[in-house]
């Protein structure tokens, strides 16, 4: 069998010798579900020629805006833009943010061609302001293109996708930064052991998670990245989150209990990804990625929107040139020891709690709203101090020195919308926890068991109405601070899986169904805890307890301090 016919940009000696043009020569399937399965299984991965054909077809079928540059545009402009300069000395566009062009298996001519294509893309897409993933995409596509012009056209179609349901590549700092925050949120929910390690070894976990796209678009070897890209072209952006989460899981598995190779975990992960072949095959990496039962694309999009909104509100929409690359994550702020004092938790314990909260609120500083030692043991005073703040953090210390609490996504003023009756409200971002005698967090049961529900459209769920006790705000959900995991987006088997928080004159309740995660009386004197369906938790402390102290904390924008 003849070796595959590589183009003039590829160093055939670097290409995987196992990839011969064996097996199928054409792809005849047209059904999306079948195409997904074939992509995940690597149907065209062992044929260089077939992969090139599949890329051509999949990219041709991307819905694009009306005016999308094609190969003829490249032929017209490349001479004017490049001039007589040597392609190897051409500068990279500013929007790649000093990202190095991965060479993969390109020869010197191929490396220069990538630079030419990137400059021509910059000429045709002046609206792209931040796109560090693009060099890797262009470099990969060049392996499977007839010439530079065809590669240019493919990249332009990916950038010009106008299907609102199929996000492909971040093209602004706001989109990139919010994606990093979203990835951090997903790690917090789906890779808790790895997240705990990151918190322990890094001063700034968001800085570590902000490197996630580089793991895929730059550090992964070509045969791994191409397999990811195969599925990405069929399924979209969510695949990238899946694979990055799988990488982090494998990193934790290999490194757990071992000393890190350096004091820079960010660099350690990069090296791990670069040498990932020592740990796991491309097939096993994808198998792990698709074994993670993520929420729907719609729910992830809601979270992304919430993170973008938080960044916009703080005026963070472009990268600040005055910030050095090593300090790029100026948006992430830790709990400052000098400004923090609690009667219940230490600075370290508060930082641990902060590592659990959604990334868009980790940008804030803790603000003491209520302290039973300052404001008295009164539930009505507790509500008064907390109203107008969303989210809040509830901390309880018992007379036995046990410490537990809850992160509560919704303003306590929502309790007044039930006509004096006790009604549940909140979203699936709520969670309960204990800190003493040992640390344990319990999230919404649907996060660990998504099979309990299927995401449904907001329109259909509103049309059908709801029989649950969850409050429905009249304001536009897009304007709410916590749209992510709102119960109205899910078909729940019973209302007990969504009893997040409730408050009346005589008591405060967190979690419901089969029991209550936390119940506190109106005098903030006595409480009880037990298993509940909403969080599937164990008792957070002694089942019946006396309260020594209660605190409620809000989230303050550092710019308003």
Curated annotation (Swiss-Prot):
It is a peripheral membrane protein. It is found in: Cell membrane; Cytoplasm; Cytoplasmic vesicle membrane; Presynapse. One of its GO terms (molecular function) is GTPase activator activity. Its main location: membrane. One of its GO terms (cellular component) is neuromuscular junction. A 1,2-diacyl-sn-glycero-3-phospho-(1D-myo-inositol) binds at residues 36, 40, 238, 242, 293-297. Gene3D superfamilies: Ypt/Rab-GAP domain of gyp1p, domain 3. SMART domains: TBC, TLDc. The Rab-GAP TBC domain is essential for phosphatidylinositol binding. Interacts with ARF6. The gene is Tbc1d24. Pfam families: RabGAP-TBC, TLD. This is TBC1 domain family member 24. Residues 343-556 form the TLDc domain. Residues 45-236 form the Rab-GAP TBC domain. Keywords: Cell membrane, Cell projection, Cytoplasm, Cytoplasmic vesicle, GTPase activation, Membrane, Phosphoprotein, Synapse. GO terms for biological process: axon development; cellular response to oxidative stress; dendrite development; negative regulation of cellular response to oxidative stress; neuron projection development; positive regulation of dendrite morphogenesis; positive regulation of excitatory postsynaptic potential; positive regulation of neuron migration. May act as a GTPase-activating protein for Rab family protein(s). Involved in neuronal projections development, probably through a negative modulation of ARF6 function. Involved in the regulation of synaptic vesicle trafficking. Expressed in brain, particularly at the level of the cortex and the hippocampus. Expressed in the inner ear in spiral ganglion cells, a collection of neurons critical for hearing and balance. The keyword ATP-binding does not apply. The modification Phosphoserine is found at residues 475, 482.
